[in-house]
């Protein structure tokens, strides 16, 4: 074979051989982009570990669940000024724990939720304890506030809450389940609620009445009431 033929064969093999792909070297920009994506992933994982804002709001939700809240009435108030009318809202709110504690609050704000929140905070500041015997009240009582007059009477178990809207809201927050009531005066919800609160504040424990009069409890309260008091103290 001649020298020229050998050169032709070498050139043909070089052309027929497949070209191998070589990976291009990573540029500086590509390396920076990958590092940034890695940092973002780490930050996202960190947020997931913190758990978001659920931990902070959990305490507020737990506090709300401890109390019974009733919005009795919401009123819109308008004030005429030079530029027109300005509207605000008032909310009458009753808050209780369902176990003898209750309070009434009156909130004012430019928005309804803010007015309700202010009313709830004011109601919690005015908590007072209501004497109870089982699921009813110890004795008949009447409360007054402005032109509102509310009468409350104890009832036997299974009677239920016989009351109108404003009175019912207060009694449900207290935790009274058997009672008779009647509104004798104004039909204004604010007056009725405050009259109901006044009536509840007039209630007295049978033991306190017996101590004030210097008499035994059996002579002050009927036998059924004394038995209910003993069961209540025993936790039955």
From Swiss-Prot:
InterPro entries xrefs: Ribosomal_Su5_D2-typ_SF (IPR020568), Ribosomal_uS5 (IPR000851), Ribosomal_uS5_bac-type (IPR005712), Ribosomal_uS5_C (IPR005324), Ribosomal_uS5_N (IPR013810), Ribosomal_uS5_N_CS (IPR018192), Ribsml_uS5_D2-typ_fold_subgr (IPR014721)
SUPFAM superfamilies registered for this protein in UniProt: dsRNA-binding domain-like (SSF54768), Ribosomal protein S5 domain 2-like (SSF54211)
Keyword line: Ribonucleoprotein, Ribosomal protein, RNA-binding, rRNA-binding
Compositional bias ranges of the Basic and acidic residues kind: 1-10, 28-64
GO molecular function, one term: structural constituent of ribosome
Gene Ontology biological process terms, A to Z: translation
Disulfide bonds: none
Region annotated Disordered, chain positions: 1-64
Domain S5 DRBM: 67-130
Any Gene Ontology CC annotation: small ribosomal subunit
Low complexity bias: start-end ranges: 11-27
Entry note about domains: The N-terminal domain interacts with the head of the 30S subunit; the C-terminal domain interacts with the body and contacts protein S4. The interaction surface between S4 and S5 is involved in control of translational fidelity.
Family, per entry: Belongs to the universal ribosomal protein uS5 family.
Subunit and interaction comment: Part of the 30S ribosomal subunit. Contacts proteins S4 and S8.
Role description: With S4 and S12 plays an important role in translational accuracy. Located at the back of the 30S subunit body where it stabilizes the conformation of the head with respect to the body.
Name of the protein described by the UniProt record: Small ribosomal subunit protein uS5
Gene expressing this chain: rpsE
């Amino acid at each position: 074979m001649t020298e020229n033929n050998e050169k032709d064969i070498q050139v043909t093999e070089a052309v027929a051989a497949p070209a191998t792909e070589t990976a291009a070297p990573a540029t500086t920009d590509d390396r920076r982009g990958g590092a940034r994506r890695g940092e973002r992933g780490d930050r996202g994982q960190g947020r997931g570990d913190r758990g978001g804002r659920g931990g902070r709001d959990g305490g507020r939700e737990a506090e709300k669940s401890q109390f019974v809240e009733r919005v009795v009435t919401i009123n819109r108030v308008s004030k005429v000024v030079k530029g027109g009318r300005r509207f605000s809202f008032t909310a009458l709110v009753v808050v209780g724990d369902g176990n003898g504690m209750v309070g009434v609050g009156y909130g004012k704000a430019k928005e309804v939720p803010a007015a309700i929140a202010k009313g709830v905070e004011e109601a919690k500041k005015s908590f007072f304890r209501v004497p109870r015997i089982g699921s009813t009240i110890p004795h008949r009582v009447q409360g007054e506030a402005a032109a509102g007059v509310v009468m409350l009477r104890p009832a036997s178990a299974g009677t239920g809450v016989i009351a109108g809207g404003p009175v019912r809201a207060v009694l449900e927050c207290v935790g009274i389940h058997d009672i008779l009531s009647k509104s004798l005066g104004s039909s204004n919800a604010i007056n009725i609620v405050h009259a109901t609160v006044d009536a509840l504040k007039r209630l007295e424990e049978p033991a306190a009445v017996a101590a004030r009069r210097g008499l035994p409890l059996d002579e002050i309260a009927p036998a059924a009431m004394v038995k209910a008091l003993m069961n209540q103290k025993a936790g039955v």
